Amino acid sequence: MERDIYLIGLNHRTAGVEVRERFALTDCNVLEQGVVPIDDVVSEVLILSTCNRVEILAVGRGPEVVSRVLRGWSAARGQCEHDLAPYVYTHKGPEAIRHLFRVASSLDSMVVGEPQILGQLKDAYRKAIERNCTRVILNRLLHKAFSVAKRVRTETGVASSAVSISYAAVELAKRIFGEMNQYKAMLIGAGEMAELAATHLLHAGISKIYVANRTFERGRELARQFNGEAIHFEDLFERLADADIIISSTGAHEAIIRARDIKDVLRRRKHRPMFFIDIAVPRDIDPDVNNLDNVYLYDIDDLKEVVEENLAQRREEASKALTIVEEETGKFGQWLRSLELQPTIVDLIRRSERIAQDELARTLKRLGPVDDETRDALEAMLSSMVRKLNHEPITFLKRRHSEEDAGPRYIDIARRMFNLDDDNVPPDAHCDRRRHDEDN
């Protein structure tokens, strides 16, 4: 049974944020081989886990690959497999390749054209390499995905008018507060999404930006870029009272802000409204915070309306991008099928070379002692014959194997025609048997 590429995942379309955070596979709680062991069934694996999707790429043999991934994934999160199954999609072969290329090109993102997903995919690939979880197929596939994403960016306008999740968050704040120049914002977390949010807040005219991060130095570095103020993480709740808008995007595995924490903050603010946007998955802010008076909490799923407006501007460019994806999916499929053909070509050449060497040995035995020049000439002649005799069959197989449906059939015919799977009978035995029949 030949190896194939499988992609098993869930995303913002198939699962709400509550489900996505339950089944998130972040770096701290999972290793690729901890979810799906590398063995005879699964030979390669990569995990992509972001705020909007969790996807597992696997190379393996047979339908057991999918069941093994689902079983390992749910177990890694301490959940039941039947709770995961309703939200999951499964792609195999060309569909898996196509889906990955769409993801890398940001055509499958909540915000089509956003640049973050490519960086997240590269990071996931780097970690998989470090853990020795990728081989020939995933290495080739991921590099191709990166080049497809580059083609989409350079040959279409998909990314030119793209918004990010951070942009959508700031747009939502502007709709609620209107003019931003009299309000202050706090960013919790100092990663890429926080940096983008700071950029958009500054452009919107926010009067002050605070940055709270577990690593104070990183928070101070980000705050310095935007003339903001860095806050020690342990002082977070003391300083929350200074902020009207809070955008949180940490990598925490459980809520860092709860309703009981905000009650005292509100009292010190004299119950002036607070606007929280939680763009982390798992969520940083307990949903119960939204039950407090004068507190407005939005999570990543609430940004869809802002995103939809932006999507309409880019549908035509997305259509051009999908054409590129289809073209590259076909090319990669041809390369993948060529891998299936390679063992047959190698076996055919080795068989021919064995026959040639056996015949050379038999001829030299009949001739008796020959000088080195004669021996070299005989070997060169046989080598040339092997090459020329194999040229047509190999060319034919390569040409026919590029046909997706017919390829495996021609491999099977070739292997039977040339006895490539007959390990018990040496190639020269067939020749001897035929000679014996002819002599009689």
Swiss-Prot record:
It comes from the Bacteria. NADP(+) binds at G189, A190, G191, E192, M193, A194. InterPro entries: 4pyrrol_synth_GluRdtase, 4pyrrol_synth_GluRdtase_dimer, 4pyrrol_synth_GluRdtase_N, GluRdtase_CS, GluRdtase_dimer_dom_sf, GluRdtase_N_sf, NAD(P)-bd_dom_sf, Shikm_DH/Glu-tRNA_Rdtase. SUPFAM superfamilies: Glutamyl tRNA-reductase catalytic, N-terminal domain (SSF69742), Glutamyl tRNA-reductase dimerization domain (SSF69075), NAD(P)-binding Rossmann-fold domains (SSF51735). Pathway: Porphyrin-containing compound metabolism; protoporphyrin-IX biosynthesis; 5-aminolevulinate from L-glutamyl-tRNA(Glu): step 1/2. The active site is at C51. Pfam families: GlutR_dimer, GlutR_N, Shikimate_DH. Its EC number is 1.2.1.70. Substrate binds at T50, C51, N52, R53, S109, E114, P115, Q116, Q120. The record marks H99 as: Important for activity. One of its GO terms (biological process) is protoporphyrinogen IX biosynthetic process from glutamate. Keywords: NADP, Oxidoreductase, Porphyrin biosynthesis. It catalyses: (S)-4-amino-5-oxopentanoate + tRNA(Glu) + NADP(+) = L-glutamyl-tRNA(Glu) + NADPH + H(+). During catalysis, the active site Cys acts as a nucleophile attacking the alpha-carbonyl group of tRNA-bound glutamate with the formation of a thioester intermediate between enzyme and glutamate, and the concomitant release of tRNA(Glu). The thioester intermediate is finally reduced by direct hydride transfer from NADPH, to form the product GSA. Belongs to the glutamyl-tRNA reductase family. Possesses an unusual extended V-shaped dimeric structure with each monomer consisting of three distinct domains arranged along a curved 'spinal' alpha-helix. The N-terminal catalytic domain specifically recognizes the glutamate moiety of the substrate. The second domain is the NADPH-binding domain, and the third C-terminal domain is responsible for dimerization. Catalyzes the NADPH-dependent reduction of glutamyl-tRNA(Glu) to glutamate 1-semialdehyde (GSA). This is Glutamyl-tRNA reductase.
